């Protein structure tokens, strides 16, 4: 935050920075979404500058339909592979321990599940040994060193940051994508402030992951709150026929400790995940049908966590009620 302000003239709220950093602990795909002009792309750009490895920008086009837009394709006529900047960056990343941030700029100007579906599936594999993507159908003696049997291992030091505008020119992002990503809403412009001159830092991805994993040990989500989350899950299943799911619970266990490690509170971290990962699913329901149930849900949240807490979730639910 101080680096972005002092070096780049970019202003971000401290909570937004906490959410952004914590998201790296929970998923490989971060979605920065909101209205145009709020600094979504600039935030991802500033992160690359801060860690001394400029972000790679892949400008998504409306014509993107499949994986070849990301990786390129083998031209059978010329017998040459037409590579993309992203593929070059992936190959380069396999040779060092820098942190790589790939910006999928305006990611929903095309259907995300068309061109990124394979990556979503691969990055969910529990073992990083399974993080491999097919590049060419056959292997050749002249293949680059890290292309083995036509496959390239997806580098563990790379994260993907999509920016998404919510307007009529874009496609809605599906639940399949949202479930596997961490969405962060940026709906307001940053307020200027004074900051001391702050330099960039070099941090290897291994040290970055060590810090994130250390937070999971030091700031593990309390059993009391996990029990409350389980009770809330049962309530939502009974009244709304929607379940949290194991994936979201795992992300919650990964995200919240990192959020606390950046200076946030456990309840605020839980509140954010519930609002953006669980209650967001209500938008796909018949809002007129669930309208009367929302007040009961808000009351149950107050009963579990206290009236003064979970404000983002309750505000989001009340906003949905007003849409009816």
What are these regions, as identified by a protein language model?
Residues 1-211:
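AAA+ P-loop NTPase catalytic core and its hallmark functional loops
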Residues 156, 196-324:
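Alpha-helical lid/collar subdomain of P-loop NTPases
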């Amino acid at each position: 935050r101080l680096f972005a302000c002092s070096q780049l003239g970019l202003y971000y709220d401290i909570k937004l920075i906490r959410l952004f950093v914590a998201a790296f602990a929970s998923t490989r795909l971060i979605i920065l979404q909101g209205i145009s002009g709020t600094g979504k792309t600039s935030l991802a750009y500033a992160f690359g500058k801060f860690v001394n490895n400029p972000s790679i920008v892949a400008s998504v086009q409306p014509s993107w339909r499949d994986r070849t837009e990301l990786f390129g394709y083998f031209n059978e006529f010329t017998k040459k592979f037409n590579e993309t900047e992203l593929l070059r960056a992936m190959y380069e990343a396999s040779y060092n321990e820098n942190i790589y941030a790939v910006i999928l700029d305006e990611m929903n100007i095309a259907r995300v599940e068309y061109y990124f579906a394979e990556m979503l599936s691969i990055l969910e594999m529990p073992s990083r040994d399974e993080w491999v993507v097919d590049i060419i159908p056959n292997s050749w003696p002249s293949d680059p060193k890290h292309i083995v049997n036509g496959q390239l291992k997806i580098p563990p030091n790379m994260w993907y940051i999509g920016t998404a505008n919510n307007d009529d020119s874009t496609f809605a992002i599906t639940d399949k994508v949202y479930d596997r990503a961490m969405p962060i809403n940026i709906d307001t412009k940053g307020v200027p402030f004074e900051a001391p001159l702050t330099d960039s830092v070099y941090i290897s991805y291994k040290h970055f992951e060590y810090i994130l994993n250390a937070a999971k040990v030091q700031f593990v989500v309390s059993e009391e709150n996990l029990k409350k989350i389980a009770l809330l899950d049962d309530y939502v299943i009974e009244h709304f026929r929607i379940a949290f799911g194991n994936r979201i619970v795992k992300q919650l266990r990964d995200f919240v400790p990192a959020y606390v490690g950046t200076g946030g509170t456990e309840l605020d971290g839980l509140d954010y995940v519930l609002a953006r990962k669980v209650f967001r699913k209500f938008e796909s329901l018949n809002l007129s049908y669930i309208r009367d149930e929302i007040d009961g849900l808000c009351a149950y949240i107050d009963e579990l966590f206290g009236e003064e807490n979970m404000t983002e979730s309750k505000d989001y639910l009340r906003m949905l009620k007003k849409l009816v």
